[in-house]
Amino acid sequence: MLDIRVVRQDPEGVARGLARRGLAAGLEHFLELDARRRNLLVEVEGLKNRRNQVSAEVARLKKSGQDATELIASMREVGERIKELDEKVRAVEEELRQEMLKLPNIPHASVPDGLSDADNKPVRHWGELPRFKFEPRPHWEIAENLGIVDFERGGKVAGARFVFYRGAGARLERALINFMLDLHTIKHGYTEIFPPYMVNSASMLGTGQLPKFAEDMFHVEGTDYYLIPTAEVPVTNLYRGEILPGEKLPIYHVAYSACFRAEAGAAGRDTRGLIRQHQFNKVELVKFTRPEDSYEELEKLTRDAEEVLQLLGLPYRVVALCAGDLGFSAAKTYDLEVWMPGTACYREISSCSNFEDFQARRADIRFRPGPKEKPRLVHTLNGSGVAVGRTVAAILENYQQEDGTVLIPPALKPYMGGLTSIQPEQD
């Protein structure tokens, strides 16, 4: 959530930031509500002052034995009016809060201008694109021929955008999870968290999924539970409503979880393969930092995610998202896009974002800089470290052989029991 004081003091600057995202709607309704709130507060304050004066006059009259009946009656009327206005103030403040919850974060000054992914800016490339002496196949075709992913039975048992991994496919998925967790905990210094797969609405609001993206979430009917769309939600909310000791920052957490997304806006997109599933696995990196350190920490977090792809030998590029392509809560985002030779394109495999104090304000996550200093909002960051199913897809396409088998990347062999290649599964 944006700082309401900034919106009040610099509405033109906030409107310019929102316009960079392609949001033409101004802040007129917010400013109108805020003015109404201020007018109500002025009226309430005036009535309370009057009530205090009348109370003093009533006390004086009673002390001198005079009749104060009329003043007492008028004071009752003032009290009723104050009560009525207090209700109006609460209603306007709630409406203001709902307006603030709808506003996305303001893009950082370093974010490129633009309104769609066509305006995103490549930052760097890593690795050489593989060359094949045959026509490379897409990962879903490779997986089906090897018998390691069952798309048809996934659809039968659960519906579209669900799959079964089997045999070496299931083993590869598990190997990648363990490989990523070991890299981030042992080498990069993250503390592992194993979070709940369901959270309450306060947690969804804290990270920015609610109220705007309710239709993209799986909600357990009749309860306050939501299936998590990413481990970012439970791990960020780990410290919701808390004041962290300043000396503990930065805090680095890594979490593996299954993720659940309705993909309400993705009808007709990526209907084949592992790229867009309702349920998928991901290893997530989450950081809590001091405000002055957060952009340096974003660069580190991005490099930590990149190392996964480098160790697996998967060519990729880093792209800075333009203002119009940023996620709702992000102030700046780098996407890692892995090369997919079967479809001859780069596909997102990780998003690494700095949310500044946007999530922390919604979730009330603060830190105390020093023993006698006032608490301040932390900055939160997160990034995929990385999406597991998409990594499986990238390995199948980049390590495919002409005979239909797939080589195991050297870094994964210890996690695959020494297996050097994936051969067709036997029914």
UniProtKB/Swiss-Prot annotation:
Functional pathway: Aminoacyl-tRNA biosynthesis; selenocysteinyl-tRNA(Sec) biosynthesis; L-seryl-tRNA(Sec) from L-serine and tRNA(Sec): step 1/1
Report the domain remarks.
Consists of two distinct domains, a catalytic core and a N-terminal extension that is involved in tRNA binding.
Q: Which reaction does it catalyse?
A: tRNA(Ser) + L-serine + ATP = L-seryl-tRNA(Ser) + AMP + diphosphate + H(+); tRNA(Sec) + L-serine + ATP = L-seryl-tRNA(Sec) + AMP + diphosphate + H(+)
Q: What is the lineage of its organism?
A: Bacteria, Bacillati, Bacillota, Clostridia, Moorellales
The gene that this protein is the product of is serS
Entry protein name: Serine--tRNA ligase
GO BP annotations, alphabetical order:
selenocysteine biosynthetic process; seryl-tRNA aminoacylation
The cross-references to Pfam families, in alphabetical order and at most eight, read: Seryl_tRNA_N, tRNA-synt_2b
Assembly behavior: Homodimer. The tRNA molecule binds across the dimer.
Question: Where is L-serine bound in this sequence?
Answer: T230, A231, E232, E284, S384
- Species of the source: Moorella thermoacetica (strain ATCC 39073 / JCM 9320)
Q: Where in the cell is it found?
A: Cytoplasm
Q: What does this protein do?
A: Catalyzes the attachment of serine to tRNA(Ser). Is also able to aminoacylate tRNA(Sec) with serine, to form the misacylated tRNA L-seryl-tRNA(Sec), which will be further converted into selenocysteinyl-tRNA(Sec).
